Amino acid sequence: MRKSKRERQRLLQETIRENPFVTDEELAEKFSVSVQTIRLDRLELSIPELRERIKHVARQSFADKVRALPLEEVIGDIIDIEPDASAISIFDVKEEHVFRRTRIARGHHLFAQANSLAVAVIHDELALTAKATIRFVRQVKAGERVVAKAKVTGKTKSGRTVVDVNSYVGQELVFSGTFEMYRSNMEKKDGDSNEYRD
Amino acid sequence: MRKSKRERQRLLQETIRENPFVTDEELAEKFSVSVQTIRLDRLELSIPELRERIKHVARQSFADKVRALPLEEVIGDIIDIEPDASAISIFDVKEEHVFRRTRIARGHHLFAQANSLAVAVIHDELALTAKATIRFVRQVKAGERVVAKAKVTGKTKSGRTVVDVNSYVGQELVFSGTFEMYRSNMEKKDGDSNEYRD
DNA sequence: TTACTTTTAGTACCTAGTCATAAAATCGGA
DNA sequence: TCCGATTTTATGACTAGGTACTAAAAGTAA
């Protein structure tokens, strides 16, 4: 059955959002209307043509790619970094990061921000978290901006680097953690458990 | 001065690699040759036309984005649960969960699996992680299946529930953590057959 | 000059559209 | 059921950024 205009336009938006590479012709076939109708729909919904959509997606990703490679894998945006000393990142808590019912941020996102910052601050080819002690000091809600501050504080006797990370919303401490990081270029060679290299 | 054919084609490749959004016309102007010459060059160098280049960039980034979205939600599948006692979940480590270079799983995914299992095992309206001590025992690689086992081990004097989570690949322990969970209804033991907190 | 490479020009055709106009089909209400 | 409005479809002219092909002009080396 052919849907109503409203319903078709709703589905059209959804379809294009899911697959921006779809042509008007394909959409026309999908909704059993003429190509002209699809074009009228796009006009009414202010959806740009295929090529413009593709260009937009490409431009975005190209801009992203220009960002430094190691920083790309960090959760949150690094705004300051002094290798092997300190680093700061910000992470905006959005709806997708919180429990639906309570709107409180899920712990692993705060952990991910802190952990990836601890990885980033270490100026080495390979950095992995060996151990961590973390404390969720207060709940973070959607809409809040979390500023994580990492500081390299020392080394364990086994040669691991210790990084302290404190995360704040405004002046308020919301998360704190101590990370023991394993790194590849340790001056002291220790018979650590099975490390994996490729 | 107009460069030799060889030199022009070398620069052409470089230019397009740096900016795939450049048209033949712009290139012709840049190298002071005709558009036809540029097209001949692309033909000889097997460089696709502008639209194909853009499409390629867009397709790549789109695939990445589709993979990145569920990354935020996937924290393992619960395969067994005994409320307020124990729970088991599995998590398949895929390419999107690992560091590209080393193919070692990023710590926050293992944490997320364990943490969300600790949340799930607590049979209450609200469960939040207050504190956690975790240990990454051995590195997990892409393709491996991580089985997390949570066990409620007791309570702190402040009334928090303590959950121990151990994660395995096969028989081998890869992650272990102790989670101190805050919960809303601490004394109440209602038979509320609630939904899973996502 | 001849022979060859390189460059330029021009044509027809393509896709996936744009914009504008007009006709046909469908729908809701009295 | 007819009327007017909305919605859909058709048509034509035009666009960018090409492909594919043919042909001629310009440059170069012997």
Curated annotation (Swiss-Prot), chains A, B:
Domain MaoC-like stretches: 102-168
A single BP term in Gene Ontology: negative regulation of DNA-templated transcription
SUPFAM superfamilies assigned: Thioesterase/thiol ester dehydrase-isomerase (SSF54637), Winged helix' DNA-binding domain (SSF46785)
Pfam families in UniProt: HTH_DeoR
Gene Ontology terms for molecular function: DNA binding; DNA-binding transcription factor activity
Keywords attached to this entry: DNA-binding, Fatty acid biosynthesis, Fatty acid metabolism, Lipid biosynthesis, Lipid metabolism, Repressor, Transcription, Transcription regulation
Highest taxon listed in the record's lineage: Bacteria
InterPro entries for this protein: DeoR_HTH, HotDog_dom_sf, Transcription_factor_FapR, WH-like_DNA-bd_sf, WH_DNA-bd_sf
Function of the molecule: Transcriptional factor involved in regulation of membrane lipid biosynthesis by repressing genes involved in fatty acid and phospholipid metabolism.
Family the UniProt entry places it in: Belongs to the FapR family.
Name assigned to this protein: Transcription factor FapR
